[in-house]
């Protein structure tokens, strides 16, 4: 039986980005294993020697993104930070971004342009509390992968540094 993979989303004007689903609904779909879309011609051999390949490629990043957003969906307070009712498009964006960052397919940039992580996160209030909650959910997802220690450390170091770099608000409101 094929492993679940998220349905693709699109950022192009006029194209649907997902279907409405209840908060907490399963993020999996019925696409064939490793496919981001029915026309995806992903060839794992193209990425030999990259961290993307070492960690397990598309399957691993799909599991990471799915597990992260399934954890987020259960946290109603933190879930409110995400404007989309359906978290699958957000999970797909995370998966594609991480695949590209770690040496895999460039699908993220092909669909969405340059990652511009700080710009894309600017509309959201990210203080140290929100960073810590995000890291808590990402820790659950990373632990679910059961990676070799060196791979886990490399991946976690990136998430920790990225989360710290995205802080754009103080924890206390400015005094009036």
Language model: regions and residue ranges:
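Core of compact, soluble alpha-helical bundle domains
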Residues: 2-176
């Amino acid at each position: 039986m094929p492993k679940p993979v998220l349905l693709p989303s699109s950022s192009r004007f006029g194209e649907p980005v997902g279907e409405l689903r209840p908060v907490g609904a399963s993020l999996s779909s019925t696409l064939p294993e490793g496919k981001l879309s029915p026309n995806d011609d992903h060839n794992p051999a193209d990425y030999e020697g990259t961290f993307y390949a070492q960690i397990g490629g598309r399957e691993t990043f799909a599991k990471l993104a799915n597990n992260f957003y399934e954890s987020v969906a259960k946290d109603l307070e933190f879930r409110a930070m995400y404007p989309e009712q359906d978290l699958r498009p957000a999970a797909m964006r995370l998966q594609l971004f991480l695949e590209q960052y770690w040496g895999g397919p460039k699908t993220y940039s092909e669909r969405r342009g340059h990652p511009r992580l700080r710009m894309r996160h600017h509309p959201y209030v990210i203080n140290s509390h929100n960073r810590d909650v995000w890291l808590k959910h990402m820790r659950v997802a990373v632990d679910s992968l059961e990676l070799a220690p060196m791979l886990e450390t490399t991946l976690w170091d990136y998430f920790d540094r990225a989360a710290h770099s995205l802080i754009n608000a103080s924890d206390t409101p400015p005094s009036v």
